[in-house]
Amino acid sequence: MGSFSIWHWLIVLVVVLLIFGTKKLRNIGSDLGGAVKGFKEGMKDDAPKISESDKGGHTIDAEVKDKQNS
């Protein structure tokens, strides 16, 4: 009773096609696909690139001076 059968989904699909038409739905689908593709490319560009010289750590030699309160 709470779930939809295949007939419910077919009726919803027919109503959506009648309201929007196939051309409008095709445009919406291509726009959505372009947005997903752009998002994936943007996520790839944000990944930090580690070069060969940055893989190792850098050592800094220095003397430690204690600050004494007088």
Swiss-Prot record:
- Residues of the region (Disordered) are 46-70
A Gene Ontology annotation in the biological process aspect, one of them, is: protein transport by the Tat complex
GO terms assigned for molecular function: protein transmembrane transporter activity
Protein name per the record: Sec-independent protein translocase protein TatA
Q: Which family does it belong to?
A: Belongs to the TatA/E family.
Subunit structure, as described in the record = The Tat system comprises two distinct complexes: a TatABC complex, containing multiple copies of TatA, TatB and TatC subunits, and a separate TatA complex, containing only TatA subunits. Substrates initially bind to the TatABC complex, which probably triggers association of the separate TatA complex to form the active translocon.
Q: Which InterPro entries match?
A: TatA/B/E, TatA/E
* Function in brief: Part of the twin-arginine translocation (Tat) system that transports large folded proteins containing a characteristic twin-arginine motif in their signal peptide across membranes. TatA could form the protein-conducting channel of the Tat system.
Major subcellular site: membrane
Q: Which UniProt keywords apply?
A: Cell inner membrane, Cell membrane, Membrane, Protein transport, Translocation, Transmembrane, Transmembrane helix, Transport
List the membrane topology term(s).
Single-pass membrane protein
